[in-house]
């Protein structure tokens, strides 16, 4: 998987982010010098976790023949500060008709989403500069 970010204008921090054939606008709030034309990068991290969790649950439920219409995943992301680790508060709002065993199984499945696993695991960075 590959993603690229390129600045769109000379005002603010608005960037067009490309992933495959998809484009998303990412920016910073006006209070941080941006133009607030899109989510900021940290919000995109929360978006990635919320959407990955929802899709993982829905894929599993579909294979099982379970109806999860109305499923909603809310993620609140608190960046690390001195002495406090990064925190993700993830709330899975599931349809009331699901049984207790189904809900417990879906909670286990939710933690298996690729973004969740990436955030839980070790991450290595290979950083370099290329002159253009």
State the predicted function of each range.
Residues 1-47, 55-132:
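Extended beta-strand/beta-hairpin segments
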